């Protein structure tokens, strides 16, 4: 087969693949896009040093969205009602010792637009849950504790991104 035929075939396959992906709604994750009416975001949590609050604010700043210290008429508000991590035993080995755990990260969030005196609810209080499994080796207990901390941090970062995607979708309605 000549180089020209291979090139044409490759281009045709690439075009067909691109068309198939775009027709199913797939697109690369890009920057967070908020409607023009929302110029800033206020993040409220019971604990001002909440790691989830900090992750959300960091993601907002990374997307060039202003984070404000109080709600205003042109801002959206993310209210973190609560978040928690739970560890569950997923499986045990033949000696009845834990071999796998499941970590569940849950967050309860509400999204509003506008200032406190003229607020409209974009998303009612909703609970989101993410989970991840990991293997546990009792001979490496110290490493397992570090692994659990890393996985918890990854789940929290994923939760922050999920909440911001919800904000973007709800704000466009």
Please describe what each predicted stretch is.
Residues 1-13:
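Bacterial N-terminal signal peptides that target proteins for export
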Residues 19-23:
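C-terminal motif of bacterial Sec signal peptides marking the signal peptidase cleavage site
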Residues 36-44, 140-145:
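Acidic/histidine-rich, surface-exposed loop or edge segments in extracytoplasmic proteins
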Residues 39-84:
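N-terminal segment of the mature soluble domain
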Residues 60, 64, 111-115, 138, ...:
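Sec/Tat-exported extracytoplasmic proteins
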Residues 79-146:
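Surface-exposed short loop/turn segments
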Residues 142-173:
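C-terminal/domain-edge helix-coil "capping" segments
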């Amino acid at each position: 087969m000549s180089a020209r035929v291979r090139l044409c075939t490759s281009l045709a396959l690439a075009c067909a693949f691109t068309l198939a992906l775009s027709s199913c709604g797939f697109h690369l994750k890009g920057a967070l896009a908020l409607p023009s009416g929302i110029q800033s975001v206020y993040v409220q949590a019971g604990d001002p040093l909440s790691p989830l609050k900090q992750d959300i604010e960091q993601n907002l700043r990374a997307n060039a969205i202003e984070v404000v210290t109080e709600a205003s008429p042109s801002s959206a508000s993310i209210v973190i009602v609560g978040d928690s991590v739970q560890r569950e035993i997923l499986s045990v080995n033949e000696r009845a010792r834990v071999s796998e755990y499941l970590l569940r990260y849950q967050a309860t969030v509400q999204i509003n637009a506008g200032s406190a005196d003229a607020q409209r609810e974009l998303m009612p209080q909703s609970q989101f849950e993410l989970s991840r499994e990991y293997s546990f080796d009792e001979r490496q207990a110290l490493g397992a504790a570090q692994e659990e901390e890393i996985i918890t941090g990854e789940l929290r970062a994923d939760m922050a991104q999920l909440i911001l995607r919800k904000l973007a979708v709800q704000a466009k309605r």
